[in-house]
Swiss-Prot record:
A biological process term (GO) from this entry: protein glycosylation
UniProt organism field: Schizosaccharomyces pombe (strain 972 / ATCC 24843)
Keyword Phosphoprotein on entry: no
Function summary: Stabilizer subunit of the dolichol-phosphate-mannose synthase complex.
Compartment list: Endoplasmic reticulum membrane
Membrane topology category: Multi-pass membrane protein
Presence of the UniProt keyword Iron-sulfur in the record: no
Record-level Gene Ontology MF annotations: protein-membrane adaptor activity
Protein name: Dolichol-phosphate mannosyltransferase subunit 3
Protein family: Belongs to the DPM3 family.
UniProt keyword annotations, A-Z: Endoplasmic reticulum, Membrane, Transmembrane, Transmembrane helix
Disulfide pattern: none
InterPro entries recorded: DPM3 (IPR013174)
């Protein structure tokens, strides 16, 4: 299955699940939150991605092999740009 098919399948599944919740009569605290659930899911997912990204950036120094690979890639990119006539400050 191609990636677009998976994305469409997840989107349709979540939409159906969200719409099915309107078939049930929920108690007061949940019925007031129901219209905002998509935004809450987006907020929670964004928070997860942000925290994961910040954690991985903060712990890069704990992985010396990743640091060496990153420095090597930067040097290769600088050499490639210099070979094309671009001046780069170190």
């Amino acid at each position: 299955m191609q990636r677009i098919h998976k994305v469409i399948l997840y989107y349709v599944s979540l939409t159906i699940l969200y719409r099915v919740t309107y078939l049930f009569d929920l108690e007061e605290p949940w019925s007031t939150l129901r219209p905002y659930t998509p935004y809450l899911f987006i907020l929670a997912f964004g928070s997860y991605l942000g925290i994961t990204l910040l954690y991985n950036v903060a712990t890069t120094n704990d992985k010396p092999e990743a640091y060496v690979d990153l420095v090597k890639d930067i040097k290769e990119a600088q050499d490639a740009l210099r070979s094309k006539g671009m001046t780069i400050e170190d």
